């Protein structure tokens, strides 16, 4: 009688260990799909095509550009900054993108936990509140530059996810 639950557990063990590996691949695929979806949403906003992601715009240096090395924690930190910037904009174009960034950050946390990476919840810019006046004066420029740089960062993240980034 004591062997009953133990025997069932041992019988199910190969299936349970196999099922463990499948979701991580699915999470990685879902992450890539969501990145592609966000890039498509940005492409659908017509005015984002007018600025290069590499172009320097005075006063908007707080918007992150491309990083040479993107670990999972750096990806999360970058997305947190973009999410904070987008939620500060009044445009309805960016609401869904901001929500997608939150979901993307959750997927990155799942990927990190699968690699036993302690990935603390990244915070956005602490100085963004002090830039309130500058943001209000240039909302359109901020939106265009932020979306353009976000798109370039997402495409870089997509490429780096294939290389299995570190913690």
Curated annotation (Swiss-Prot):
GO terms for biological process: activation of protein kinase C activity; adipose tissue development; adult feeding behavior; angiogenesis; aorta development; bile acid metabolic process; bone growth; cell surface receptor signaling pathway via JAK-STAT. Keywords: Disulfide bond, Obesity, Secreted, Signal. One of its GO terms (cellular component) is cytoplasm. One of its GO terms (molecular function) is leptin receptor binding. SUPFAM superfamilies: 4-helical cytokines. It holds the Pfam family Leptin. It is found in: Secreted. Transmembrane segments: none annotated. Residues 1-21 form the signal peptide. Disulfide bonds join 117-167. Its main location: secreted. Belongs to the leptin family. Key player in the regulation of energy balance and body weight control. Once released into the circulation, has central and peripheral effects by binding LEPR, found in many tissues, which results in the activation of several major signaling pathways. In the hypothalamus, acts as an appetite-regulating factor that induces a decrease in food intake and an increase in energy consumption by inducing anorexinogenic factors and suppressing orexigenic neuropeptides, also regulates bone mass and secretion of hypothalamo-pituitary-adrenal hormones. This is Leptin. It comes from Felis catus (Cat). The lineage of its organism: Eukaryota, Metazoa, Chordata, Craniata, Vertebrata. The gene is LEP.
